[in-house]
Amino acid sequence: MTFDINDKTAIITYEGSDTIGRPFLDEIIFNYKSFSSLNIIIDLTPMKSVLFKHIHDFTELASRHKEQSDKSFVIVSGPIALRLLPDGLNVVPTLHEALDTIEIEEIERDLGF
């Protein structure tokens, strides 16, 4: 996996050699303190086949991140049945949309929504 961290956002990208599932999530959690104060994007687009369970694995981390840091957590994924995803989990099809989602959520936080 690669970590691309700037002043507002950490983009964590899956690479083909990564083991998806718990090992992937565990590595993110292990490094979490280094980007816990930032918006987080998990980019799974390089993954050939994204399953519901791969997305669902991030539910707890996403919820905790939003509550504790008051920052955004967005997952970028290829085709997946959005109706099956837990409420409150942001999943979008492109990195551009992930960045747009973060921008909108930052505006909402600034306005007190």
Name each model feature, range by range.
Residues 2-113:
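Amphipathic, Lys/Arg-enriched alpha-helical "gate/interface" segment within cytosolic domains
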